[in-house]
A protein has these predicted regions:
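Switch/communication elements of ASCE P-loop NTPase nucleotide-binding domains
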Residues: 1-65, 247-302
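Phosphate-coordinating catalytic segments in nucleotide- and nucleic-acid-processing enzymes
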Residues: 4, 67-277
Length: 302
């Protein structure tokens, strides 16, 4: 679970910004609280209030720790342009089964780490300074890595430990594995002037292919019908790719060519909703919130 996130000098965040997920001083609905942290929430604000950039900041971690899909084009102009500081700083705080995990690092662009540190229950277990090329790992089972960790490789040392060691079966290492698993199952998706996602999986599967390949086309039709969108959907293959088409008497049309912007956003929402069965651990979406909230309000008991 996320406890806290802090970012500084990344894109619009000239000064340090902290987003706290602890529920200590607030009265929230109990169903959105887990391990005393907020597990579900909405961040809203006027246009240009940095909501999208906050999402990119939170998901910066997947760039160097995972092999998942990445929105690298969104990380142009990485550093804040009003700040003379040439370093962006990130700090993530998690809690897994009562154990605190703090991961922090600095970068000067999306792909270049300057330093990183991982602590479990206030004990620093991995550290590396990429400028001085010095560091260490204290996790049991990584002894041999200490001979090669101080190299010129730009790879995250946390990622290096995860990919190249057989960790001993102890509580500290289990917490480390839960941290890696959490980051590997984070997902950001959006639908604004274009659709995209990063984290959780790889590839460019279309929404139509994803729904059809999951065997969910009839359920997707029912999903839309319950909202009052009376489409009769069918699968149609075009140039070797599966597409969703709408049938109208003796005619048919590509769903995504006739659907409204709001309906397309619902299709995107549904695409990722049916994947939540695969245990997405952290989800951030930036799409037509009004449409989704109206759906939830109208069909909350469905």
């Amino acid at each position: 679970m996320f406890k806290k996130f802090t970012v500084e000098n990344f894109k619009v965040f000239q000064n340090k910004l902290t987003l706290a997920f602890q529920a200590d001083n607030y009265d929230f609905n109990p169903e959105v609280i887990k391990n005393n942290c907020i597990s579900k929430g909405i961040i809203y604000g006027v246009n240009s209030s940095a909501k999208s950039n906050l999402g990119l900041a939170i998901f910066d971690i997947i760039i160097h720790l995972t092999e998942r899909q990445k929105l690298m084009h969104s990380y142009d102009f990485y550093l804040n342009m009003s700040n003379s500081n040439s370093v962006a700083n990130f700090e993530y705080e998690f809690i897994f089964d009562g154990h605190d995990v703090v991961y922090k690092y600095s970068k000067n662009d999306a792909t270049f780490l300057l330093n990183e540190s991982l602590s479990i229950d206030n004990t620093e277990v991995i550290f590396f300074d990429f400028t001085r090329k010095t560091g260490f790992t204290k996790l049991e089972g990584t002894d041999t890595l200490n001979n090669s960790i101080n190299s010129d490789s730009p790879i995250s040392r946390v990622k290096l430990v995860n990919n190249n060691s057989i960790l001993a079966d102890n509580e500290q290492n289990r917490v480390f594995n839960k941290f890696i698993h959490f980051v590997d199952n984070m997902l950001l998706f959006y639908s604004l002037d274009s659709r995209g996602y990063e984290g959780f999986m790889n590839g460019t599967e279309s929404i139509s292919e994803g729904i059809i390949n999951s065997g969910k086309l009839p359920d997707f039709q029912s999903f839309l019908n319950r909202i009052g969108i009376d489409y009769k959907l069918k699968e149609q293959e075009i140039d070797g790719r599966k597409n969703i088409y709408c049938s109208f008497n003796n005619k048919s049309a590509d769903f995504f060519k006739i659907a409204s912007t709001g309906t397309k956003s619902l299709a995107l929402f549904y695409y990722w909703y049916i994947r939540m069965e695969k245990r997405l651990l952290f989800i951030l979406t930036n799409l037509m919130l009004f449409t989704i909230l109206n759906y939830q309000k109208k069909y909350k008991n469905s």
